[in-house]
UniProtKB/Swiss-Prot annotation:
<feature type="binding site">
    <location>
        <position position="49"/>
    </location>
    <ligand>
        <name>[2Fe-2S] cluster</name>
    </ligand>
</feature>
<dbReference type="Pfam" id="PF22117">
    <property type="entry name" value="Fer4_Nqo3"/>
</dbReference>
<keyword id="KW-0004">4Fe-4S</keyword>
<dbReference type="InterPro" id="IPR010228">
    <property type="entry name" value="NADH_UbQ_OxRdtase_Gsu"/>
</dbReference>
<feature type="domain" description="4Fe-4S Mo/W bis-MGD-type">
    <location>
        <begin position="233"/>
        <end position="289"/>
    </location>
</feature>
<dbReference type="GO" id="GO:0016020">
    <property type="term" value="C:membrane"/>
</dbReference>
<dbReference type="InterPro" id="IPR050123">
    <property type="entry name" value="Prok_molybdopt-oxidoreductase"/>
</dbReference>
<dbReference type="GO" id="GO:0048038">
    <property type="term" value="F:quinone binding"/>
</dbReference>
<dbReference type="GO" id="GO:0046872">
    <property type="term" value="F:metal ion binding"/>
</dbReference>
<dbReference type="GO" id="GO:0042773">
    <property type="term" value="P:ATP synthesis coupled electron transport"/>
</dbReference>
<feature type="binding site">
    <location>
        <position position="124"/>
    </location>
    <ligand>
        <name>[4Fe-4S] cluster 1</name>
    </ligand>
</feature>
<comment type="function">
    <text>NDH-1 shuttles electrons from NADH, via FMN and iron-sulfur (Fe-S) centers, to quinones in the respiratory chain. The immediate electron acceptor for the enzyme in this species is believed to be menaquinone. Couples the redox reaction to proton translocation (for every two electrons transferred, four hydrogen ions are translocated across the cytoplasmic membrane), and thus conserves the redox energy in a proton gradient.</text>
</comment>
<dbReference type="Pfam" id="PF00384">
    <property type="entry name" value="Molybdopterin"/>
</dbReference>
<feature type="binding site">
    <location>
        <position position="243"/>
    </location>
    <ligand>
        <name>[4Fe-4S] cluster 3</name>
    </ligand>
</feature>
<feature type="binding site">
    <location>
        <position position="247"/>
    </location>
    <ligand>
        <name>[4Fe-4S] cluster 3</name>
    </ligand>
</feature>
<dbReference type="GO" id="GO:0008137">
    <property type="term" value="F:NADH dehydrogenase (ubiquinone) activity"/>
</dbReference>
<feature type="binding site">
    <location>
        <position position="60"/>
    </location>
    <ligand>
        <name>[2Fe-2S] cluster</name>
    </ligand>
</feature>
């Protein structure tokens, strides 16, 4: 069970109190609730409204106990333990037992007999406690109260008001944890019910948690409703693949098909919460375009159609093509692969292909970022943890919007601000809704001005806070697009002594970094340029030497492929639309003589590949993700045996391919990869210095122009959300954000259409007038009607044209 919400024993030795429960003395920290003290003794007091991560409310009254000296039973979930208190639970007190039976009878008066068809049946606290702490029959003979059922809270959450027992778990979660007022208690007395605000848009990223913590079947998920009973399902622990938060999850499946995912209980990471994307976006792995067999070009013709073939034949064709291009092959690895798979790509590139041309950053990036990662992040023990965020004297965010880019970081920062008064500052163009929910403070900055803003913080009130032990600076991957941004963040950390954390958006990026999938890094954060580091890797891999010259980054690989300097590409799980210029990526693939793709589903990359190998989704393979903290999150396959897909883990495909090329890769299993990585360990030598890139400062747009800024929303047009229409239904409405003066300059009013354009395309969306710097325009990067990279062919920091109308 997660640490009780009412107890804070983080610092020093807590003051203790001693009480007696059912005749047994127990000492607990001062402030502990009676219900928690009973739990420590193994006594389970029935309850519905109580939740260890929510503030106590005493709404359901089911946890009544007898307390010596009190005139009537007290709710144990709101009663604080005190010295010499004597408590008797339902196990030893007839008064407590009778009170609990009476409350249960009242709760069941209007509760429908839906158990045979209710989704909660079989895992329902009300069902279980009605049996253990309720009457065997009902004395109520009148007609039960009824409501229309169900009503839509959102596209993915349904409310059955007849089943609701008014425990207020859902409303407290929305208010206390998520900060989204999407559900509340309405009316009073016998008319009281849970409802939504008619004039408020439903825009919570965390609504699915209310379904999970509902103690009855009042809140259900649209996608799972009437699909299965809990006792029909097999449950497997898993790890979320959608972002770098590293959430523990539970995957429930039946007959080889995943039916639902729930948040796992991990107090050190996601506590008991997850975001809606992690909960519901899993159907992408069962779409009709999933690749189920290896593919090659018909008759070996580069322009021929892709046709199914055997694994052995596909291996032979791929081995022949890659062997012919040895030393002239680039490796592009997406940021979604596991730690072990990334290691296999890094090792395959070096010893099988003889190249350091490998990069996991299939997105806008920079050489400065590579230097920053090598100097500050790779091969280092966990510098900042989730717990550190709660105890920090200050947290500074730059190039990072946690609610959209790492939702569990957002929840932890909101908790830190709300419960521990941790001040959160962000360097950004405007204050987002997420920042308001964290009670955060904005350091308003023009895109490109982040380095100057960071330098200015070295002195003053914020600088003093950052100089306090435990202070944290969190940088997102978007800061890589600002020249001098990461250098300034590192400089500020050095000046103040603050700890530095890097939060990528994708689940596999930190693991790929630690695995050495960068052109200048070897596994464990070893610098490629260091002779000792290369010697260590050579010894571990049982080879004489490694290629010593620094390789090309992703942009360099694509440019070299486009001009035919490179003869082949090995591509693992990239999306061209993630790059600033998707057309350039596709042109590079078209120009490459030989392309091997390892992919889950058909894509623009597989259409251009000469050999395609199907790879398995996370539900069908073992592996590990490394989250933003540097914490290793291992998982086993949830689905075993025969399924619809015949894909293998990337490392198994690469191991077999290396064998066909006459090279022993040595990673046929995740255990083998982990053993090698453990033997190598992290680099204990000198890390590269840097980065030291000078800032160029923000550009100056003319009238009718603006600097583009933006980020990807959590719920957008990403392919990992394919097949989940209910989730897409609650994505936030895409808008163009402009300052009042900029909107007036182009003659646009709030809500009117604004067009953002370049010489290569345009985007038209409603205008949202926002308090932000002038001649700056914000767009969601990959939402419906606003796929910036595909439509504009530029990325953030570029100058674009803006105008009213379409």
């Amino acid at each position: 069970m997660t640490q009780a919400a009412d107890t804070d024993i983080r610092v020093g030795q807590p003051e203790m109190v001693t009480l007696t429960i059912d005749g047994v003395e127990i000492s607990v920290p001062k402030g502990t609730l009676v219900i928690r003290a009973a739990e420590l003794m193994g006594i389970q007091i029935p309850r519905f409204c109580d939740h260890p991560l929510l503030e106590p409310v005493g709404a359901c009254r089911q946890c009544l106990v007898e307390v010596e000296g009190q005139r009537k039973p007290l709710a144990s979930c709101t009663t604080v333990a005190t010295d010499d208190m004597v408590v008797r639970t339902q196990l030893t007190s007839e008064i407590a037992d009778k009170a609990q039976h009476g409350v249960m009878e009242l709760l069941l008066i209007n509760h429908p007999l839906d158990c045979p068809m209710c989704d909660k049946g079989g895992e329902c606290p009300l069902q279980n406690q009605a049996m253990s702490n309720g009457r065997t029959d009902s004395r109520f003979t009148e007609a039960k109260r009824t409501f229309a059922k169900p009503i839509n809270i959102s596209a993915q959450v349904l409310l059955d008001r007849e089943r609701c027992i008014l425990c207020a778990r859902c409303t407290r979660f929305s208010d206390q944890i998520a900060g989204d007022p999407f559900i509340d208690m309405q009316e009073r007395g016998a008319l009281q019910q849970v409802g939504i605000y008619a004039d408020e848009p439903f825009e919570s990223y965390f609504s699915g948690n209310t379904v999970q913590i509902c103690p009855v079947g009042a809140l259900t998920g649209t996608a799972y409703r009437f699909r299965a009973r809990p006792f029909d399902l097999v449950s497997s622990p898993s790890v979320c693949e959608h972002c770098a938060s590293g959430c523990a999850q539970r995957t429930d499946h039946r007959r080889g098909k995943v039916l639902r995912r729930l948040a796992g209980d991990d107090p050190e990471v996601n506590e008991e919460w997850n975001c809606d994307k992690g909960r519901w976006a899993f159907t992408y792995a069962t779409q009709p375009d999933v690749i189920t067999t290896p593919l090659i070009r018909d008759g070996g013709d580069p322009k021929g159609a892709l046709v199914p073939t055997s694994w052995s034949h596909a291996m032979a064709v791929a081995a022949q093509g890659l062997a012919a291009a040895r030393g002239r092959t680039g490796v592009l690895v997406g940021g979604r692969v596991t730690w072990e798979d990334a290691y296999a790509y890094a090792k395959f590139a070096r010893i099988t292909l003889g190249t350091n041309d490998i990069d996991f950053r299939a997105r806008p990036h920079s050489a400065e970022e590579a230097d920053f990662l090598a100097a500050r992040i790779a091969g280092r023990h966990m510098a900042v943890s989730y717990a550190d965020l709660e105890s920090a004297p200050v947290v500074l965010l730059v190039g990072f919007e946690p609610e959209d880019e790492s939702p569990i970081v957002f929840l932890r920062l909101r908790k830190a601000a709300r419960r521990h008064r941790v001040p959160v500052y962000t360097i950004a163009p405007f204050a987002t809704g997420g920042l308001h929910k964290m009670s955060g403070r904005l350091i308003k900055t023009v895109p490109g001005g982040e380095p100057a803003a960071l330098d200015d913080l070295a002195t003053g009130a914020v600088g003093d806070l950052l100089a306090t032990p435990g202070a944290v600076i969190m940088v997102g991957e978007r800061l890589a697009t600002v020249p001098g941004g990461l250098s300034a963040a590192a400089r500020l950390a050095d000046t103040t002594g603050a700890r530095l954390a890097w939060v990528p958006r994708r689940a596999g990026e930190r693991g790929a970094l630690e695995a050495g999938a960068l052109p200048t890094l070897l596994p464990g954060g070893r610098p490629l340029a260091d002779e000792v580091a290369r010697a260590q890797v050579c010894a571990a891999w049982h080879i004489a030497e490694l290629p010593a010259a620094a390789g090309r980054d992703a942009d360099g690989i694509l440019a070299a492929a486009a001009d035919e300097t490179l003869a082949a590409l090995l591509v693992g799980g990239i999306e061209p639309a993630d790059f600033a210029d998707p057309d350039a990526v596709l042109a590079a693939l078209d120009a490459t003589g030989f392309v091997v793709s390892l992919e889950l589903r058909h894509s623009a990359v597989t259409e251009r590949a000469d050999v395609v190998f199907p790879v398995a989704p996370t539900t069908q393979k073992a592996g590990a993700f490394v989250n933003w903290e540097g914490r290793y999150r291992t998982f086993e396959p949830a689905l075993r045996g025969s399924t619809l897909q015949a894909g293998q883990s990337d490392h198994r495909v690469l191991d077999a391919l290396a064998d066909d090329m006459g090279v022993h890769l040595g990673v046929p299993t995740v255990e083998a990869a982990r053993e090698e990585l453990a033997a190598l360990g992290i680099w204990d030598g000198k890390h590269a210095a840097g980065p030291h890139i000078a800032a160029t400062g923000p550009t100056q747009p003319e009238a009718g122009e603006a600097i583009l800024t933006g980020w990807r929303m959590l719920l957008d047009e990403g392919r990992l959300q394919d097949g989940e229409p209910y989730l897409a239904g609650t994505a936030r409405t895409p808008v163009v954000r402009l300052s009042p003066d900029t909107a007036a300059e182009i003659g646009a009013a709030d809500g009117e259409a604004v067009t953002v354009s370049t010489s290569r395309g345009s985007i038209t969306l409603p205008c949202s007038v926002t308090d932000m710097p002038d001649r700056v325009v914000w767009l969601p990067l990959n939402s419906a009607g606003s796929t910036v990279h595909r439509q504009l062919r530029v990325t953030i920091g570029s100058i674009v044209k803006i105008g009213a109308g379409s």
